[in-house]
Design a protein with these regions (language model features):
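A short, conserved alpha-helix in the catalytic core of glycosyltransferases
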Residues: 17-18, 76-94, 99-128
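Active-site donor/metal-binding and catalytic loop motifs
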Residues: 37-39, 101, 123-145
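Short beta-strand-to-loop element that shapes/binds the nucleotide-sugar donor at the catalytic cleft/hinge
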Residues: 30-50
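Short, flexible, basic/aromatic active-site loop/helix in glycosyltransferases
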Residues: 51-76, 80
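Catalytic core of nucleotide-sugar-dependent glycosyltransferases
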Residues: 141-171
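Short beta-strand-to-loop acidic/aromatic patch adjacent to the donor-nucleotide binding site
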Residues: 1-9
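Conserved donor-nucleotide/metal-binding helix-loop-beta segment in metal-dependent transferases, i.e.
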Residues: 13-31
């Protein structure tokens, strides 16, 4: 199952790198993600190259000429979309949990369900790339509701459900934000 946001532009060979990695590991217990190139300079933690933030100002030529020049390592601990997981695993854990809708906290929650099923590969493949326009759908929604859900509400739901914060799970279990490729 490949999960993606509705505001992503998939760059050449994005799928090749994901499929190749799946073939290499010979396991159904994985979570592979592509790295996002952000069109919104306020988003941190990804690659940055402004090629537009709407369909109207999208500079496809600029993006295609420059995306391969951006450097980043592969790393473990990813919770980013787009991500690829085996269909059997997706069905076993029930996919995304509805209590996190419209999305805030849903990725770490899915990762926790996968962790509890024994998944220890949560790898972002830096050569598999997408351009992210910056939460276009969410920008159209009630900003006060999303801001509340994005932060404290999502963290509270996660804490009550799993007995730890999203930050604790990402830091001590997934070891997110560190460049490493060893099993967790």
């Amino acid at each position: 199952i490949l999960y993606s946001h509705d505001d992503m532009y998939f760059l050449p060979k994005w799928d090749y790198f994901l499929i190749n990695k799946v073939k290499q590991i010979n396991s159904k217990k994985f979570y592979f993600s592509s790295i996002m190139i952000n069109g919104d300079p306020n988003l941190k933690g990804h690659l940055n190259l402004f090629a537009g933030d709407t369909l109207e100002n999208f500079d496809e030529k600029k993006l295609l000429e420059n995306y391969q020049n951006l450097e980043h390592d592969d790393f473990q601990g990813s919770t980013w979309a787009p991500h690829l997981i085996h269909k059997e695993l997706w069905n076993k854990v029930g996919g995304f949990s509805e209590e996190f809708s419209p999305g805030a906290g849903s990725d770490p929650d899915l990762n926790m369900k996968l962790w509890n099923e024994g998944v220890r590969i949560f790898q972002c493949l830096s050569k598999s790339r997408v351009y992210h326009f910056g939460s276009v759908t969410i920008r159209k929604k009630n900003k006060n509701f999303f801001k509340k859900n994005q932060g404290s509400l999502a963290n509270k739901i996660f804490l009550l459900k799993w007995g730890m914060s999203i930050k604790t799970f990402k830091k001590f279990y997934l070891r997110s934000h560190f460049i490493h490729n060893n099993p967790l």
